[in-house]
Design a protein with these regions (language model features):
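Secreted, disulfide-rich extracellular signaling modules
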Residues: 1-227
Length: 227
């Protein structure tokens, strides 16, 4: 394992002081003061995929199925990872009647227990954007007024940690997607906010539909028949 040393400088009065001594016939104690630059600076970020499920994949512009990651989805700021969510079987509910109307749709995403801690904390919000078949973002999942980008609500369970989840109301998206096919279908991109991607190493791991705490889409819908 490798350590990632991080510290913050509150103001220009902070300093890193190196104390040392020079060997000679008498005591010769010295110190070297490193005065910090309080401006934000980025040098380089590298990551090693050796001995991981991602080892065989190219480094850029590649889609990795969740099945190849142990049935997991991963978000990782700094290196730009996000997760695409698809709903290939949504239209199957149309077979249940002549007309189907979605009343409500809720998406729950369960962070994998053990991948976060008091130090590597869960973000208060994550976000969903709507993208076409070429992963071009066309819109965002918004609040019930249709104005603000909806941040997934973090619901914590401090007793049964596996019950901690993010909740999204995706009713309008599912209504729009029902009955579409081919190039008219869309997916959802699960992401952090832009500041997290450019300024942090925040990360999130969660299960797909086959994981220990699977991602869940709950649909409430009505079926109509003509007699």
């Amino acid at each position: 394992t490798c350590a990632l040393p991080i510290f913050q400088v509150a103001d220009s009065l902070s300093a890193l002081i190196l104390h040392y001594h020079i060997e000679s016939g008498y005591e010769n104690h010295q110190k070297l003061v490193f005065s910090p630059n309080t401006a934000t600076q980025f040098n380089q970020l590298q990551h090693d995929r050796h001995d991981t499920p991602m080892e065989t994949y190219p480094w850029k512009k590649v889609e990795i199925p969740s099945a190849e990651l142990g049935n997991r989805g991963v978000l990782f700021a700094g290196i730009g990872w996000y997760t695409r969510l698809e709903f290939p079987y949504l239209n199957d509910i149309m077979e249940q009647g002549e007309y189907v109307h979605i009343e409500k749709a809720g998406l729950r995403i369960y962070p994998e227990y053990g991948t976060y801690s008091g130090y590597n904390t869960l973000p208060d919000s994550i976000f969903l954007y709507i993208a076409d078949e070429n992963n071009v973002v066309t819109d965002a999942v918004k609040d019930y007024l249709g104005k603000q980008v909806q941040g997934g609500k973090l619901v914590k369970d401090d007793v049964f940690l596996g019950n901690t989840y993010y909740y999204f109301d995706v009713t309008q998206f599912m209504k729009d997607e029902l009955g579409t096919s081919g190039k008219y279908k869309h997916n959802l991109q699960l992401v952090f906010n832009s500041d997290d991607y450019t300024k942090t190493l925040r990360n999130l791991t969660f299960s797909d539909t086959k994981g220990q705490h699977p991602i869940t889409l709950q649909l409430n819908y009505k079926i109509y028949e003509s007699y």
